[in-house]
């Protein structure tokens, strides 16, 4: 993905949303790339016996989508000086369409503060984050 030219944001501005689909193939690719081969993510028989009832995406895969949205919004400012405090709220599952969005809550002392979240198509919050980016 090519980062767009950074734009100036003010408190209350919405960040450009991003949508991604979670598939078992994407989860498996993430497992290979990250080295995280927990059977909860890749073994459907095992995962069916857990509280989740099936495989789920790695939480960090969901946060990667959030980071992709922030890169699109802030470009190099996010990549070189951004900070995120995230909370996982619900699992992402194969077949989910994840929409990532956020808004600027405050601009103070050269820092943009944002709230962001990832939701599935049912509107359930999968992850939320407080974000700081150099203005």
Outline where the language-model segments fall.
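HotDog/MaoC-like acyl-thioester-processing domains
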Residues: 1-15, 88, 92-135
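Catalytic strand-loop segment that frames the active site of acyl-thioester-processing enzymes
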Residues: 1-55
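A generic structural signal for short beta-strands and their flanking turns/coil linkers
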Residues: 11, 18, 26, 36, ...
């Amino acid at each position: 993905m090519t980062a767009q030219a950074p734009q100036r944001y003010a408190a209350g501005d919405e960040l450009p949303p991003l949508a991604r689909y979670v598939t078992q193939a994407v989860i498996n690719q993430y497992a290979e790339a990250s080295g995280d081969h927990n059977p909860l993510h890749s073994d459907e028989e095992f995962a069916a016996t857990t509280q989740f009832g099936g495989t789920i995406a790695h939480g960090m895969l969901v946060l990667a989508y959030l980071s992709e949205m922030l890169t699109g919004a802030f470009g190099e400012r996010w990549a070189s000086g951004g900070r995120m405090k995230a909370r996982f709220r619900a699992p992402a599952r194969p077949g989910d369409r994840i929409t990532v969005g956020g808004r600027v809550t405050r601009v103070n002392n050269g820092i943009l503060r944002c709230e962001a979240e990832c939701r599935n198509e049912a509107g359930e919050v999968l992850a939320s984050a407080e974000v700081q980016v150099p203005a």
